[in-house]
Amino acid sequence: FPIVGIDVVAGLKNILNGDYEYYRLELSVKHDFDIAPLGYSDIMLSGGKIFNKVPYPLLKLHEGNATYFYDPYAFSCMNFYEFASDLWGAVFWEHHFRGFFLSKIPLMKRLKWREVATVKALWGTLSNKNNGSLLNTDAIFRFPEGMSSVSKPYVEAGVGIENIFRFIRVDAIWRLTHRGDRSGQDVDNFAINFSLHLNF
């Protein structure tokens, strides 16, 4: 069955030294399902909205991953503080082929390596009151150089091998949109990530 998550965060001005009053609502749905004989998929859909004007650290700062360690719910080719939103939606999809292709190659069949594919996508907007990248902004703080909204969807995709020595996974990930260097930030259009977990 799908797993549904609802997060509600409230900031109350003048309560416990709070400087801003705002409300943040986030909804997520996670589901795993088999696609026989091609393996199984894990998918998560998430989205949210921030109400009222807030400084940019309280916006949704989309999770970039500048490390070599794989995070299923972060974007491997996105920089930290690259994109911010006050209304957003995202999808994180992983498909585990369980050796559907590699098991047809004799040496690979003996190694029991398994293929995995990923697609991650994000869309978000900023209302004028929170858009600190505008020249004549009404936002509380100006954005750091290179931070912007993600009104043009951000997409990355990858392929990987898991079950290496029974616990290592290696992913190669490509950034498919927003590929040019941005003001104040260098963009990586390709990343290699590693993770450790047991597959039985």
Q: Each predicted region: which residue ranges?
A:
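Exposed, low-structure sequence patches enriched in small/polar residues
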Residues: F1-F200
